[in-house]
Amino acid sequence: MAPRPLGPLVLALGGAAAVLGSVLFILWKTYFGRGRERRWDRGEAWWGAEAARLPEWDEWDPEDEEDEEPALEELEQREVLVLGLDGAGKSTFLRVLSGKPPLEGHIPTWGFNSVRLPTKDFEVDLLEIGGSQNLRFYWKEFVSEVDVLVFVVDSADRLRLPWARQELHKLLDKDPDLPVVVVANKQDLSEAMSMGELQRELGLQAIDNQREVFLLAASIAPAGPTFEEPGTVHIWKLLLELLS
């Protein structure tokens, strides 16, 4: 099929995306960019660690703040980049990690979302960049600034899986040392591909076995306010191990 000619609206959107990409990169460099130090010991199995749960959140009371001692030092920060095609479930993944219930329907991210999650030893900053075609061009600019990449894939979207594979391998090639967690999302759907099929179709079996690439299942679907999906807890546990 011959490529369609670009109309004025498409050109305008492309220019806006270019500006947005530049702004995103500046924001990232200003607030999160600090380079990356390797922390993952390949001799330690992440699945053997103590069971982890999603972060718990308490109501903030201004009266409590007056009685608290000032912090002696700030917690170190760890950066996680969350990418994937539009509609894969990146925003829902961030909501679930932050203790919020998933939203009904699909609301695309026009720009980025960010979440900061506290742990005992450090704070985890997760940045999601939208998965529209115009924004994918800028993904590679961010991978060298983070500690871990999370790549979310819609397990039921067979039609666009080749595009997901292409974008994933671009990122893998950009930084051979970056740990990558591939989230096989929407495994609860009847049409979802199996983990074995996804591993083949995403070309993960061809990756050097010395590379830190993990494929984990998730079923991040709308549910009640007490929703806590086991797959997401498993992913959070792995992230803590990779970031420690």
Curated annotation (Swiss-Prot):
Pfam families: Arf (PF00025). Keywords: GTP-binding, Nucleotide-binding. InterPro entries: ARL10, P-loop_NTPase, Small_GTPase_ARF/SAR. One of its GO terms (cellular component) is mitochondrion. GTP binds at residues 84-91, 128-132, 185-188. PANTHER family: ADP-RIBOSYLATION FACTOR-LIKE PROTEIN 10 (PTHR47575:SF1). Belongs to the small GTPase superfamily. Arf family. This is ADP-ribosylation factor-like protein 10. It comes from Homo sapiens (Human).
